[in-house]
Amino acid sequence: QYLALWDSGIKDAWFPGPIFEMTSQWTLLRRSPEWIDQEFNHFTNYISGTHRSLGHNDNAYNNPYMFEYWANKHGVEIMSRIFQETTLDDKTESGQLNFIKTYKRLTHINQEQLNEEMYDAASRFITWDLPRIEMAYAARGANVHTCQLVQLGVTYRISPERCPSNYGYNGIKLTVPEAGTTVKVNFRGIINSSEYNIHKPNNAQWRYGFLAVLKDGSRVYGEPSKEDIGSASLQVPENTEHLWLVVAATPKEIYDTGADNQWPYQFTLDNTEPDGDKCRVIKK
C-alpha cells in the first residue's frame, strides 16, 4: 500500500477510500486463487454486500473481484497503470479522484461500455466465471448469492437494505421451470421514493437479465436489457440446475466511489418466482 501511494501519477494527491486495501486483497487473490478458503469470512461479507457501490468502505477487505475482472480483460498491468497514470482529469464533480474514471480513460471506453462491463462482471460473479478463480470458487462460491425483496401482490421490490448503489448489483435466485419454458422479467426502475436514498434521478439506469446454470456447470447468459421500464426473457435450457435474475445499478454518471445513493427497482415475473432459499421475500 505504501509503494502504491508513492507510485501515484499525481504527487500529493491520491485516491480516497479503500482502493489500497482492495488492491492488497487482489494481489493475494492473484497469488492464491483459493483465497475463498483462506479467508471465507471476507467472502461471506462480500456476498451480503454486493449491493454496495464499487469502492465502498465496507467492502475494503471483501471485494477484489472487479480488479480480477479487469485484469482478466486487460492483463494485470491495468492495476499498476491505474495508480501510475492517474491525472487530475480523473476527478468527480465533488473533486475526488476516482479510480473508475481512471480505468475508463485508460481503456478508452465510454460510459455506455463501462456500464455494459459492470453488468457482465456481475453476471459472471454469480458462478465466478473468471479463468483464474473459477475452479477454486466452484464448491463454496458458485450459486450462493443472496438477496431480499418486498412482495406487494404480484410485484417484487428490492428492499432498502439490499438496494444497489453505484455499480452494486443483486443476484436473485429463481425457481427453475420445465426446460423450454420462457421466463420473463417485467422491470420498472424507481426514481421517486422516500424509502431510498435517491440522488440525481435523471442519471438512473439499470441493466438486468437472466443466467441459467446447467448441471455440468456451463452457463447460458440471457440478453440483458437497460430500459427503465422494460423486460428481459430467456428460454430455459435443458438440464438447468440454477436460474438467476441479475440486476446491476449502472448510472449514467460516475459518482464518488463511497457514495451511498441508491437505485431502487421493482418487477414482476412470468413462469418463475424467487427461490425462498437464497432470496428472502417479505410479504406486505
Predicted regions and their residues:
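Zinc-dependent metallopeptidase catalytic helix centered on the HExxH motif
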Residues: 1-37, 44, 48
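Structured segments of extracytoplasmic/periplasmic soluble domains
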Residues: 2-5, 27-30, 34, 69-77, ...
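Short consensus segments that form the blades of beta-propeller domains
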Residues: 13-15, 57-58, 198-202
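Stable alpha-helical elements in mature extracytoplasmic
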Residues: 19-23, 27, 63-66, 75-82, ...
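Beta/coil-rich, acidic/histidine-enriched accessory regions frequently appended to metallopeptidases
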Residues: 90-284
